[in-house]
Swiss-Prot record:
CDD domains recorded: SAICAR_synt_PurC (cd01415)
Family of the protein in this entry: Belongs to the SAICAR synthetase family.
Keywords carried by this UniProt record: ATP-binding, Ligase, Nucleotide-binding, Purine biosynthesis
Name of encoding gene: purC
Record's protein name: Phosphoribosylaminoimidazole-succinocarboxamide synthase
Pathway given in the UniProt record: Purine metabolism; IMP biosynthesis via de novo pathway; 5-amino-1-(5-phospho-D-ribosyl)imidazole-4-carboxamide from 5-amino-1-(5-phospho-D-ribosyl)imidazole-4-carboxylate: step 1/2
Catalytic reactions on record: 5-amino-1-(5-phospho-D-ribosyl)imidazole-4-carboxylate + L-aspartate + ATP = (2S)-2-[5-amino-1-(5-phospho-beta-D-ribosyl)imidazole-4-carboxamido]succinate + ADP + phosphate + 2 H(+)
EC number(s) on file: 6.3.2.6
PROSITE patterns in UniProt: SAICAR_SYNTHETASE_2
InterPro entries membership: SAICAR_synt/ADE2_N (IPR028923), SAICAR_synt_PurC (IPR033934), SAICAR_synthetase (IPR050089), SAICAR_synthetase_CS (IPR018236)
Pfam families attached to this UniProt entry: SAICAR_synt
Main enzyme class: ligase
Molecular function GO labels: ATP binding; phosphoribosylaminoimidazolesuccinocarboxamide synthase activity
Lineage top rank: taxon: Bacteria
Source organism (scientific name): Limosilactobacillus fermentum (strain NBRC 3956 / LMG 18251)
Amino acid sequence: MEEKLLYAGKAKEMWTTEDEDQLRVVYLDQATQLNGKQKEHFAGKGAAAHAISDLVFHYLIDHGIETHFIKKLSATEDLVEKCAMVPLEFVTRNTVAGHFASRFGLEEGTALPQPVEENFYKDDELDDPFINESAAVALKMVTPAEFDRCWAICRQVDQLLTPLFEKAGMQLVDFKLEFGRRSRDNQIILADEFSPDNCRLWDTTTHHHLDKDVFRRNLADLTATYQEVYARLQAALKED
C-alpha cells in the first residue's frame, strides 16, 4: 500500500503505513514561532529533536508510562501508534518563564511553590487560547475521566523527568504534553514528542537556555543546542 501524508505540522510529518493502526512520523529540519507564522530551516535539527524524544520516551516507557512510540526507523523517523489526538495542550510549569511571566508580570526564573497546570486549545488561527476543564468537556474535546488521566500522566512525567534533567545539569522549567486515543483500543496515551521544541530547559549553573528559546530570542545555534541536550541526557543515563 502506498504511504500517504496524513498530517504536516510545524516540525513533523505523519505518514500512513501498511498497518492502519500505525503511522510513520518524520522529524523535520525546521522550527517555528508565533504559532507557525515564522518558520526557519536548521540543518540537523530534526535528527537532534528526534534523538532526544526517543531517549525520553524510552525512559518514560521503562518507568511505566504508555506512549505512542513503537520503534525507531531512522535518524529522523519513528513508527508510532495511530491516535485520534485530543485537541488540548497540557502545560506543566515548575518555574516562571515565557508567557506565564508576561501574563502575570512576574520575573522569569522565579520558583513556583508547586507545579502550575494549564490547558490550551490547539488552534493556530485562534492562537491556542486558554481553556479549562469544564469548557473542554462541554465542547466534547475530552471526557472528565480522560482529562484526569492526562493530568495524572503529566504529573508522573514531571516526577520522572525533573530529577533526570537535574542529573544532566538542566532545570526542567516547563513542558507541554499532548495525548491521543490509541486507534486499536481508544485508550488515552502520551503522544507527540518530548524535546526542547515543547519544553524549557535551563543550565542549572548559568541558567542559559537549552531549548527553542535560543531560536525565539536569537541566543545561540538551535541544532547545536539540541545536540548538547542529547549528549547531556545520554551521559546522565549511562551513569545509572
